[in-house]
Amino acid sequence: MLVSYNWVKEFFQDFPLTAEELGEAITRTGIEIEGVEELSASLKNVVVGEVLSCERHPDAEKLNKCLVQTDEVEPVQIICGAPNVAAGQKVIVAKVGARLPGGLKIKRAKLRGEVSEGMICSLAELGFESKVVPKAYAEGIYVLPAHVETGVSAITLLGLDDAILDMAITPNRADALSMNGVAHEVGAIIHQKPAQPTEPDVSEKGKADDFISVEVENPAETPYYAIKMVENIEIKESPLWLQTKLMKAGIRPHNNVVDVTNYINLLYGQPLHSFDYDKIGSKKIVVRSAKEQEEITTLDGEKRTLQAGHTVITNGVEPIAIAGVMGGEFSEVTENTTTVALEGAIFSSSSIGKASRELYLRTEASIRYDKGSDAWKVEKALAHGGALIAELSGGTLVGGVVEVDNREKAVNKIETNLTRINRILGTAITLAEIETIFDRLGFVLEVKNDALIIEVPTRRWDITIEADILEEVARIYGYDEIPVTLPATSTTGGLSDSQKARRVMRAYLEGAGLNQALTYSLTSKKDATRLALSDEKTVALSMPMSEEHSHLRTSIVPQLIRSASYNIARKNMDVALYEMGTVFYATEGDNLPIEQEHLAGLITGNWHTVDWQKTPKPVDFFVLKGIIEGLVNKLGIKSELHWKQTEKEELHPGRTASLILEGQEIGYLGALHPAVEANYDLKETYVFEINVAALLDATKEKVVYHPIPRYPEMTRDLALLVDKNTDHATISQVIQEHGGKLLVDIELFDIFEGESLGENKKSLAYTLTFLDSERTLVEEDVQKATNKVIEALQEKLHAIIR
């Protein structure tokens, strides 16, 4: 927000700070000032002149030879190329020796043989941006009102002896999106009460009820709506003081009605809108929800298609404005307008923000409604706006307002105590200082025993909890006044078991060769349900920024697939990613969604880098399976991880398995379906996703120290011919159960399938390792254990020992 330093000073009788000092003081209290611009820093010798005569340059069709009276005794000749210059005008003159923005210095010169002693200026040449220059003067010089005295400083007249503070208003301080709000903030800083804006003293005639009535169909979306009438008006340029205030705030002046609505918006932070009463076509205004695909042409000339849920102002039949966003061209105030219906309203901030984003239409009004506003200042703003329009247009202010009021008045009281304030802020503030701070803020303080009860004015709707009160105390007391103190005793920090486990998981996966990815939690409706661990409903955003980010994810894998596709499109063919993040599932009613932490991974391409020592190895199911099993072992989980063949949409039906831990399904591992791979230009790609809570909650084994064995181990190799559907986990379990206490390790070292083995058969070869920590094993011990294993395999799995 652009804030005029001179306008701020108008609120106070004795202002003690320079513009630079004010900027620094506001920044110290929590509102960032991005810059302070002195408007007159590059201006000098610019005065009001009167064009006594104007004739065409004898040697140039587009130049005019003007005789101009300034503050000098004799008039001077100035050659001017502006198409709108004419005799009798009061204009802005940069005299010889004047300085203008951009480093331009005015010198006496000859133009096509004629002497020019100065320059008649446009507003752009004085430093105003072209977007704020009134359209009537966009292509030429600026013509001043006829009553302006010749020779006076144009810098002072145009308010350029000013500084502009560029305030970065954060969403929590929307109260500062008005000059009145800024004045209260400044008043708290300098410990002065700001003067309240006063409206012109204009008498009223007649009754607004005779002109119009109002109906609001949805009070929740429009808690307050009112119309103030002004008749017999004359549309013309606004006075210079109003135009310069608007231009310095970055707003283009239009006419004395529209400019007043913009001025009131700047002053109070309360948007107003003016309708040409005679164009409304009805004596009744109905505020309702838009119909699906209903259309309106807005003031910018664009035809806009509305959605159900957008609030519109109608004449009972068709929309004449999009509530809180922009008016309709149909009821626009023009030079022929004689009666104005002035709207002041409070709309739901969420609905206005939603409509603004969906229509891609952001205005000064929608910004303020979206961020929230003081619901109890609208009457004051409407009265001030109506009176000012009547004064500037010579119109008649109609008595009363037509309103629908469904607001609920509630006193905002927050309780705290001095001990708590000092403990949390680390200060030693006294009660007297607290009383002074709240007096400076304009808050009402009531002291009851140890309790401090603070009544917050409605202009500070951002303050709702005790923490907000403490922040206000810290701001006004001064952040730089809060002493820096070290804790009296040292507190030993430490990680929780779950934090340690997460670090172990990340370190293990990165050590295994996977790279950590961070993807968006927001996804499209299509991707929201893909490859999820659960069938729970998805969570849709009520106001999404785009269709691609309209839902909260239920699985991390789709985003990893997109990341892999992105990398491969850029010739990074070997991709190995993992992500530990949150997924979301909808709950019944308006309850918050269920949040679960998941671990997901993806590999594609080759697993090892190609060099002269290594042969490239394409990724496969078992690479990722081994990584997951290694992770479970690294976490010290006591129970064994089991794998169960399954089918899952978008995964290969023959290469997908569920992960079973302690009897519960905790995730899946599988190859992407060829059709999915084709959609993303991927080749052999494997993914997994696991519920992290299941890993963290699993029973852990205690770490027990075992000395290095003193006695040698013995090994036996077994080659088994089994049914093709018999998996490694089942075989390992049988071997483990019957191998006895001497069996310490089982290692699969070969799998073979072929026609020579017979139909639906496969061969698996294992190395069994035996060890006794107390004595040297003998052949008989190992053979006895091996025989038991063989018998069990033959009996339970019908295995044939090869």
Label the predicted regions.
Residues 112-131, 136-143, 155, 163, ...:
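Mobile "lid/hinge" segments at catalytic clefts and subdomain interfaces of large enzymes
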Residues 24, 64, 195-294, 607:
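Glycine/proline-enriched, intrinsically flexible loops and inter-domain linkers
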Residues 48-78, 150, 255, 261-330:
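Conserved mixed alpha/beta core segments that line enzyme active sites in large multi-domain catalysts
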Residues 440-443, 594, 600, 608-802:
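A carboxyl-terminal module marker
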Residues 181, 414-418, 422-575, 716, ...:
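Extended, well-folded interaction surfaces typified by the phenylalanyl-tRNA synthetase beta subunit core
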Residues 41-44, 203-204, 490-496, 519-537, ...:
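Beta-rich nucleic-acid/ligand-interaction surfaces
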Residues 190-216, 395-421, 428:
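Terminal amphipathic helices with adjacent charged low-complexity linkers/tails
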Residues 1-206, 341, 364, 368, ...:
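Phosphate-backbone binding interfaces of nucleic-acid-interacting proteins
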